[in-house]
C-alpha cells in the first residue's frame, strides 16, 4: 500500500519524523520505502478565468483573459475542445514556467493580441497522461499561488507500507493513524459524520440469502447524478500518489474512500425501479458477463448481488455488462457489505469470483462500526461533486448470524508469565483503552472486548502482544526461556531413522526438507475427503494449510526437478504430519512419517544399461530393504487396497503384523495431469512410530549344519496374492524351514486364463542336526498339500503329484 505523507498527517495530531516510521515498523506495519514526490514542472501558478474572447477554429484554440493577481491580467490560450466558465480557477504556465519534459512557453500573437500564457492540462504537468483534461483548482485557493505549494510537491513524500495478512487495520490511512496514535498516547482519530439531505424517496429491499457469510448489508440509491464532472485535483493527486489511475469521478471517489477508510463500496448503474437487492450465491449453470461483455467463470460458491432478474455485480465488485457504470449513467446504487472472514478465507467454502484487491480487504475483515459513516462519506462526495438526489439508507442484518464482539479473559498470571511482572495493572488498563479495547477489571483477570477493526485478536496471548507493543519491546528485560514441554527421549527411534536415511542415500535417493505448510489446492487433489487445517495468518496462499502427508513436498520436488530436465528422480523426507483427532489437544494429532518418491528412469543413461522407466516393484523392493534392515521383513505384508490418489491396480497398504503402517502406489493419471507430472511417479509413506518402537534384537546360534534348497512351481488363480502363499509356506515346520523366496512369476497360454505360475525356493536347515533327504521331502510334500487345499494350487512338476 502506498499513500501520501500529507494524507496521513491529516489524521494525526503530531508531526512525523524518521523515528515515527521506525516505530511503525516495530508495531507490525512495515515501512518498505519512503520516496520524495517527483515534480515535473516549475513556476506554474493559479489563474482565474475572467472572460472568453474568441476562437481560432483553424488552429482549434481559444483565447482567454486570465487574472493572475489583483494587478495583473494576461491573455492565455487553450484547446477549443474544453469548456470554460467565468470564475473557474485553472493552472497557468507563463514564460517563466517549465513544463513536463522541460517544455517552455513562447508568446503567440493573434489579431493584435499577445498570449503570455497557456492553460495547463494534466499531461502538460506530467501528472496524468490525459491531454484534454485541464487542471481545475478549487475556488478557495488564491490566484497567483504556486501549484506545487497547493499540491504539496515541495514538502510531501510517498510512503510504501505492508502489513501482516491478519492485520486488516494496516490497509487504510485511518487504521494506520489509529495504531500510531495509540502507540504515542494520543486520542484515536474518529471519522466525521456527514449529514445527507434525503431528496429521493425510492423504496427497495435488501435480502440476504446467505446469512452465515454476509452478516449485514447497507445501501442507498442516488438519482440524477452527473458523472461527466471532473474529479477534484486534490483527490486525483492523492490517488496518483497511491499508484491508482483515474477512471471516472465515481470510481475515483470510491477508491479514495477505500484507501482512507479501508471500506469497500459497491457501485453499479440501475435501470428503472429496483425492488430487491439480493445477496446470494450463483445458481447452477448461471452465467456472468463483465462490463467488457467477457464471460467470467462462476460456480455455486461465488457470492454475488442481483435483483429479481439478473446478476448485478460479483462479490469482488466486478460489475455485469448491464450494470456497468459509464459517463451517461444517471441513477446509481451504493452499498457496503460485512462478510464473515471465517467463511471466505477458505476457498473451499465461498469465493467472490477471481481474486483482486477488494477480496483482500474482505478476507482480512472490514470494520463494521464505520459502515454507515463510510457510505455517508461517499454519498457526501458524490453529491458535492456530481450532484444528485440521495435516498435513505436501507439496512439488512443476517437472520442467523450477528456481529458479536468477542469477549476475552486476560489472566494476570498469564500476563506476568510472559512479561515478568513489569507492566502494572494500571498501565494494562491504560494501554488497552488507548488501543480501543473495552476493559472490565476483575479480581484475577481483565475482561476485554477488542475494537471492531481488530479481527486478528482471538485469544489472550493476542491481547498481551498488543500490550507489549505499546509498552515497548525494548522495555522488556531479557530472560531465559522457560518451557513446559516434556521431552520423551527415545533414541532408538531416531537412531533407526538415521540408519534408514543412510540406506536410502546409498540407494540413490536425495533427502529433501520442505515446509509443514503446503498449498491447499494440491493437498485437496491428493486427499479430497480428508479435513484440512487452514492457517489464519499464512505466509502466502501456497502455504495456507498444514500438511496431511509428506507427498505434497515430495511431488513438488519432482515437479521442480522435472522442469529442469532431470530424468532420474529419487527423493525421501521425514517429518511431522497433522490429522484430525478429537482425543488429542486442539483436535489435531501429529505423527512422524517417512516418505519417498521415484519418477522418471531407473538409472542415468549409460552404455551398460538401458533407459528403463521406474516401476511399482522398484519402490516395493526398496521398502523391503528398509524392513530387512529393521529386522521386520518377515512380519511385513503388502495388501491390495484402493486409494483415491493412487492407481487402483498399482497400490497397496503396508501392514506390520496386523496393523497398517503405510501406503505404496503409483500416482493416478488424473493427479499427474493436474500437477503436470510427465513421468510415472511412485510414492510410499510409512508411519515411522509404528515400526521403529518395536525393534527386537534376538541372539541366536549360527547353525553348524549344512542347508539344502528345493524349488517348486505352482499354478494358482491370478487373484491370489503371492504374499499369502509365502506366509502359509513359512508357517509349515518353522523349526526346519529357514527361508521361503518367490523368484519367478509367469503368465502365459499354457498356464491358463486368469492364472499365474509362481516359482518358490525353499531353504531347509536345522540348528540341531543335518536334515536327511527323507525329512526334506516330507516337509516339502506337506507344504504342497496345504497349498493345494488352501489355494487349489496345481504343481507344475508331476513328480510331486499325489
Swiss-Prot record:
Its EC number is 6.1.1.20. Its cofactor is Mg(2+). It is found in: Cytoplasm. One of its GO terms (molecular function) is ATP binding. One of its GO terms (biological process) is phenylalanyl-tRNA aminoacylation. Residues 403-478 form the B5 domain. Residues 703-796 form the FDX-ACB domain. Residues 38-148 form the tRNA-binding domain. GO terms for cellular component: phenylalanine-tRNA ligase complex. It catalyses: tRNA(Phe) + L-phenylalanine + ATP = L-phenylalanyl-tRNA(Phe) + AMP + diphosphate + H(+). Keywords: Aminoacyl-tRNA synthetase, ATP-binding, Cytoplasm, Ligase, Magnesium, Metal-binding, Nucleotide-binding, Protein biosynthesis, RNA-binding, tRNA-binding. InterPro entries: aa-tRNA-synth_II/BPL/LPL, B3/B4_tRNA-bd, DNA-bd_dom_put_sf, Fdx_antiC-bd, Fdx_antiC-bd_sf, NA-bd_OB-fold, Phe-tRNA-ligase_IIc_bsu, Phe-tRNA-ligase_IIc_bsu_bact. Mg(2+) binds at residues 456, 462, 466. Belongs to the phenylalanyl-tRNA synthetase beta subunit family. Type 1 subfamily. NCBIfam families: pheT_bact. Tetramer of two alpha and two beta subunits. This is Phenylalanine--tRNA ligase beta subunit. It comes from Buchnera aphidicola subsp. Baizongia pistaciae (strain Bp). The lineage of its organism: Bacteria, Pseudomonadati, Pseudomonadota, Gammaproteobacteria, Enterobacterales. The gene is pheT.
Amino acid at each position: 500500500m502506498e499513500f501520501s505523507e500529507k494524507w496521513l498527517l491529516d489524521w494525526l495530531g503530531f508531526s512525523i519524523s524518521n523515528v515515527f516510521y521506525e516505530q511503525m515498523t516495530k508495531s507490525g506495519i512495515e515501512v518498505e520505502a519512503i520516496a520524495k514526490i517527483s515534480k515535473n514542472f516549475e513556476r506554474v501558478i493559479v489563474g482565474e478565468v475572467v472572460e472568453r474572447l474568441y476562437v481560432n477554429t483553424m488552429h482549434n484554440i481559444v483565447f482567454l483573459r486570465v487574472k493572475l493577481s489583483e494587478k495583473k491580467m494576461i491573455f492565455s490560450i487553450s484547446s477549443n475542445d474544453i469548456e470554460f466558465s467565468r470564475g473557474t480557477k485553472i493552472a497557468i504556465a507563463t514564460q517563466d514556467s517549465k513544463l513536463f519534459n522541460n517544455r517552455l512557453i513562447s508568446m503567440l500573437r493573434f489579431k493584435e493580441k499577445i498570449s503570455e500564457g497557456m492553460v495547463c492540462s494534466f499531461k502538460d504537468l506530467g501528472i496524468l497522461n490525459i491531454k484534454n483534461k485541464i487542471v481545475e483548482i478549487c475556488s478557495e485557493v488564491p490566484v497567483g499561488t504556486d501549484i506545487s505549494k497547493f499540491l504539496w510537491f515541495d514538502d510531501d513524500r510517498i510512503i510504501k507500507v505492508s502489513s501482516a495478512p491478519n492485520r486488516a487495520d494496516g490497509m487504510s490511512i485511518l487504521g494506520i493513524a489509529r495504531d500510531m496514535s495509540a502507540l504515542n498516547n494520543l486520542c484515536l482519530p474518529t471519522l466525521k459524520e456527514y449529514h445527507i439531505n434525503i431528496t429521493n424517496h425510492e423504496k427497495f429491499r435488501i435480502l440476504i440469502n446467505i446469512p452465515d457469510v454476509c452478516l449485514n448489508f447497507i445501501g442507498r440509491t442516488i438519482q440524477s447524478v452527473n458523472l461527466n464532472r471532473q474529479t477534484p485535483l486534490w483527490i486525483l493527486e492523492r490517488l496518483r500518489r497511491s499508484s491508482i489511475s483515474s477512471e471516472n469521478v465515481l470510481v475515483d471517489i470510491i477508491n479514495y474512500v477505500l484507501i482512507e477508510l479501508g471500506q469497500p463500496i459497491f457501485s453499479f448503474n440501475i435501470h428503472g425501479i429496483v425492488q430487491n437487492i439480493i445477496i446470494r450465491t450463483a445458481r447452477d449453470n448461471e452465467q456472468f458477463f463483465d462490463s467488457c461483455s467477457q464471460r467470467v467463470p462462476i460456480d455455486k460458491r461465488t457470492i454475488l448481488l442481483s435483483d429479481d432478474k439478473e446478476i448485478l455485480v460479483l462479490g469482488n465488485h466486478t460489475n455485469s455488462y448491464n450494470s456497468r457504470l459509464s459517463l451517461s449513467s444517471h441513477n446509481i446504487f451504493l452499498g457496503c457489505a460485512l462478510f464473515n472472514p471465517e467463511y471466505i478465507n477458505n476457498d473451499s467454502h465461498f469465493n467472490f469470483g477471481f481474486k483482486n484487491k477488494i477480496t483482500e480487504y474482505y478476507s482480512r475483515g472490514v470494520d463494521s462500526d464505520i459502515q454507515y459513516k463510510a457510505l455517508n462519506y461517499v454519498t457526501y462526495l458524490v453529491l458535492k461533486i456530481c450532484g444528485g438526489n440521495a435516498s435513505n439508507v436501507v439496512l439488512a442484518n443476517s437472520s442467523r448470524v450477528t456481529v458479536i464482539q468477542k469477549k476475552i479473559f486476560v489472566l494476570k498470571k498469564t500476563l506476568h508469565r510472559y512479561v515478568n511482572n513489569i507492566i502494572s495493572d494500571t498501565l494494562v488498563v491504560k494501554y488497552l483503552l488507548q488501543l480501543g479495547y473495552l476493559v472490565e477489571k476483575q479480581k484475577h483477570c481483565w475482561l476485554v472486548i477488542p475494537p471492531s477493526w481488530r479481527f486478528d485478536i482471538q485469544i489472550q496471548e493476542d491481547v498481551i502482544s498488543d500490550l507489549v507493543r505499546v509498552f515497548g519491546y525494548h522495555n522488556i528485560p531479557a530472560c531465559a526461556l522457560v518451557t513446559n514441554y516434556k521431552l520423551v527421549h527415545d533414541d532408538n527411534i531416531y537412531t533407526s531413522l538415521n540408519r534408514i536415511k543412510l540406506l536410502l542415500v546409498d540407494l540413490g535417493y536425495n533427502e529433501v526438507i520442505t515446509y509443514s505448510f503446503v498449498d491447499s489446492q494440491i493437498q485437496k487433489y491428493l486427499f479430497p475427503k480428508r479435513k484440512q487445517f487452514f492457517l489464519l495468518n499464512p505466509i502466502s496462499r501456497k502455504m495456507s494449510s498444514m500438511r496431511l502427508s509428506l507427498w505434497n513436498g515430495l511431488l513438488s520436488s519432482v515437479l521442480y526437478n522435472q522442469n529442469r530436465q532431470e530424468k532420474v528422480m529419487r527423493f525421501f523426507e521425514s517429518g511431522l504430519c497433522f490429522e484430525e483427532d478429537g482425543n488429542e489437544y486442539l483436535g489435531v494429532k501429529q505423527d512422524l512419517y517417512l516418505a519417498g518418491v521415484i519418477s522418471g528412469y531407473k538409472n542415468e543413461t549409460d552404455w551398460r544399461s538401458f533407459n528403463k522407466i521406474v516401476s511399482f516393484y522398484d519402490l516395493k523392493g526398496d521398502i523391503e530393504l528398509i524392513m530387512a534392515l529393521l529386522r521386520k521383513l518377515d512380519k511385513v505384508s503388502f495388501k491390495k487396497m484402493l486409494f483415491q490418489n493412487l492407481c487402483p491396480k498399482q497400490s497397496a497398504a503396508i501392514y506390520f503384523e496386523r496393523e497398517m503402517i503405510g501406503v505404496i502406489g503409483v500416482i493416478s493419471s488424473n493427479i499427474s495431469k493436474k500437477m503436470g507430472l510427465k513421468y510415472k511417479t511412485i510414492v510410499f509413506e510409512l508411519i515411522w512410530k509404528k515400526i521403529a518402537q518395536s525393534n527386537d534384537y534376538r541372539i541366536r546360534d549360527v547353525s553348524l549344519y549344512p542347508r539344502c534348497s528345493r524349488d517348486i512351481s505352482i499354478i494358482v488363480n491370478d487373484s491370489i496374492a503371492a504374499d499369502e502363499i509365502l506366509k502359509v509356506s513359512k508357517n509349515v515346520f518353522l523349526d526346519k524351514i529357514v527361508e521361503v523366496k518367490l523368484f519367478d512369476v509367469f503368465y502365459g497360454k499354457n498356464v491358463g486364463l486368469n492364472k499365474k505360475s509362481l516359482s518358490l525356493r525353499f531353504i531347509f536347515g536345522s540348528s540341531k542336526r543335518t536334515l536327511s533327504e527323507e525329512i526334506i521331502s516330507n516337509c516339502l510334500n506337506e507344504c504342497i498339500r496345504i497349498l493345494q487345499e488352501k489355494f487349489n494350487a496345481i504343481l507344475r512338476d508331476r513328480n510331486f503329484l499325489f
